[in-house]
Each structure stands twice: as C-alpha cells, then as structure tokens.
C-alpha cells in the first residue's frame, strides 16, 4: 500500500510506466473487504490530487472505488474522473459529479451474485453481511444519477467464478433506466469514459469493428443481451469474427482496419 504524497506519486508513475492506461484508487471502504468500514474515506486529499496530477501528466485519468456520498464528492473535487460502484450516493454528491463532468460505473449484478454465491465461494461472513447494505441502494442510486444528469457506464465487478453473470447487468439497468440507456452505458458512454469516442461504441466509418448481430431487437427485449450469447449470431472484435452462426456471412472473412 502506498502511503503519503511522495509514495502515491511514485506508485502512479510506476504503474503508468508498466503500461497502465488508467489509475484506480480506493477512495472509501469496500464490501468484499472485511476490515475497512464502508463509510470510511481513504487517502488524504493531497494524496488523491497527487495521483490525479500524475495521471493527467500521462494524458489519462483516475477512477475511484467509492460508495458514500462523502467519499464520492471528496474524490471528484480532487479531480477523479470516474466513480466505480457509487451505491450510497446522495443528491449533493450527484450534483458535484455533474458540475465536474464525472462519470459513474455502477456494478449492480455483483451484489446479486455475491448474495447468492458469496458464502459458498469463501467470502467472509462480515463481507456477506455488507452486501445487503448496498444491494438495494445500488438500484436506487441509478435514479439519483439519472435525475442529476450523471452519465453511467457499464460494469460488473464480478469475481472470477461469477463472470457468467455479467450480461445480467443489462437487465438490472433496463428495469430502472430503460433498454436504450442500458445499451448506451456499454457503448457510447463507455467510449466517452475511455476517451475513445468515435472509435469505440459506435457503428461508423473509421471506427473499430467491434460489432454484434442480435437475433431480435434489444430495444424491445433486453434479455436478448443477457445469458451466454444465445441470441448473438455474430461477434466481431477489431474486425475479426469470433462467433458466427449467420448463414449469409463467411466466418473466415475479416475486416482490415485502416
């Protein structure tokens, strides 16, 4: 653990030198971790600002694990660009995010999965108990972010054995925000978070050919994007076909990016 302004500055530089494209910090206590209360803030404001300065020097940004409104506001005021989780946000914190142009990446499916399988997979009892303190609040947080104009990206935060649940996040989001906004969170908004608009999250000339063909219209039925790809007849990444059940497309064909 890096401790102190000089130490966090060095740690950020080292991670960037090793190829990190973004820097993530812990700005509050967590759920899966049994020893840090979720209401605590972590890192001093000077430490956070030092990390942000190093990220900006490398033309990138800082994302912060944060749950409470206090931790969220504090991190954003110090220059953090993206909040991960953010379940316990309040209206004041959402306004701060909007004013600073910050994003949030909710990770709601992980709480359902941890509530179901956490104990079986070895999650400590204290951590299992924390899940319910943020599970419903996470769903409620979507309404707060939407009401205050905070853009939401797509995330899952699932542990290794739970990755099969990640697309269920679409269903949870759609129940509250509607199908279109659930899809935008994983396409155009995600591209904006990564500062790669026009390259990712869009279908246009010159963009990376990351494409799927869906058997049906997910604007009508978001469940078409859930599961294990049962309704995806074509998956293309960077112009290369990884899955193809379309009768009208040659699976060996590839697109050559300019």
What are these regions (language model features)?
Residues 1-11, 61-63:
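Active-site mouth loops of central-metabolism enzymes
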Residues 57-61, 126, 134-218:
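His/Asp/Glu-enriched, well-ordered alpha-helical/loop segment
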